[in-house]
């Protein structure tokens, strides 16, 4: 089966784009976790990474929604930056592991960390969508 006949998620070029983006996002996340120390017992780097990633993903997908067709450069951008890059950058597994680790000694902080990450991440995603929709798109009269 040729690359053109496969569904987009099974094409080798799409898989490659996601893999490259994922490696870059994961590398960036790892570098940030090395550079940003914990804030007491709270893994602030992972919190920040997940919130920033949620904002960027909301903004990216809202911008790409304007182009309605998920083909060509729009698809490559979504796969490379969205699925790969931001998927590798953000981390639910580290959030889960950090929450369990924190719960051993500070259960209240663990609950606040987990809920705070999810709630603030959702708000950041909404803010990214809003920014793309209201601030970055040209108005209808332009």
Where are these regions (language model features)?
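Membrane-interface helix-loop junctions in multi-pass transporters/channels
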Residues: 1-142
């Amino acid at each position: 089966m040729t690359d053109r006949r496969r569904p987009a998620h099974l094409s080798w070029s799409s898989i490659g784009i996601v893999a490259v983006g994922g490696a870059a996002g994961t590398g960036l996340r790892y570098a940030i976790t090395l550079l940003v120390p914990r804030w007491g017992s709270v893994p602030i780097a992972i919190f920040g990474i997940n919130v920033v990633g949620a904002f960027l993903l909301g903004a990216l997908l809202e911008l790409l929604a304007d182009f309605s067709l998920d083909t060509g450069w729009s698809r490559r951008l979504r796969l490379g930056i969205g699925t790969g890059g931001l998927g590798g950058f953000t981390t639910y597994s580290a959030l889960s592991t950090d929450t369990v680790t924190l719960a051993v000694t500070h259960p209240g902080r663990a609950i606040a960390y987990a809920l705070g990450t999810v709630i603030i991440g959702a708000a950041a995603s909404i803010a990214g969508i809003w920014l793309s929709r209201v601030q970055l798109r040209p108005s209808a009269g332009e």
